[in-house]
């Protein structure tokens, strides 16, 4: 019994020290798309109930996110209001489908490249700051 206990403690010590020494990218841990609430909503079945009003299951992901930010316990906070507004803007500014081919990154000017980098950052879609910076760079494209 003593050998089992000693070997168990030794294994736990090695395993815990290995986990503690492991480096991790915090952006991978806080990415909103990986949150359980987002995972459950994306895999949930569509509502079969027909009615006049839209249900949560029938809304687009931006509709759901905007409503979630508005309805949270601290939904009146500036951060949640900014995020809800950002989702509402994204719903309005969805580009129409086209057959155009996008410019390659090497053909873009510095502002176009900066806008793309801000939008494609690990937390670019969920960060208000990255979206604002991307919009700022895009406005400078038309000015130049």
From Swiss-Prot:
Domain of life (superkingdom): Bacteria
- What name appears for this protein in its UniProt entry? Probable copper-binding protein PcoE
Q: Where is this region: Disordered?
A: 86-144
Q: What induces it?
A: By copper.
Compartment(s) of residence: Periplasm
Regions of compositional bias (Polar residues) in chain numbering: 96-107, 122-132
> What function does this protein fulfil?
Required for the copper-inducible expression of copper resistance. Activated by the two-component regulatory system CusS/CusR.
* Gene Ontology CC entries for this record: periplasmic space
**Major place of residence:** periplasm
User: Keyword Signal, does the record have it?
Assistant: yes
Q: Which UniProt keywords apply?
A: Copper, Metal-binding, Periplasm, Plasmid, Signal
Ranges of compositional bias, category Basic and acidic residues: 108-121
The entry lists its GO molecular-function terms as:
metal ion binding
């Amino acid at each position: 019994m003593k050998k089992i206990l000693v070997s168990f403690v030794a294994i736990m010590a090695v395993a815990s020290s290995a986990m503690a020494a492991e480096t991790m990218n915090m952006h991978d841990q806080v990415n909103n798309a990986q949150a359980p609430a987002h995972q459950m909503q994306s895999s949930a079945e569509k509502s079969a109930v027909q009615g006049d009003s839209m249900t949560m299951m029938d809304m687009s992901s931006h509709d759901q996110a905007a409503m979630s930010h508005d309805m949270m316990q601290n939904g009146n906070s500036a951060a949640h209001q900014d995020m809800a507004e950002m989702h509402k803007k994204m719903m309005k500014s969805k580009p129409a489908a086209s057959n155009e081919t996008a410019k390659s990154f090497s053909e873009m000017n510095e502002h176009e490249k900066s806008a793309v980098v801000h939008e494609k950052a690990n937390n670019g879609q969920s960060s208000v700051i990255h979206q604002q910076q991307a919009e700022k760079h895009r406005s400078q494209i038309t000015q130049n």
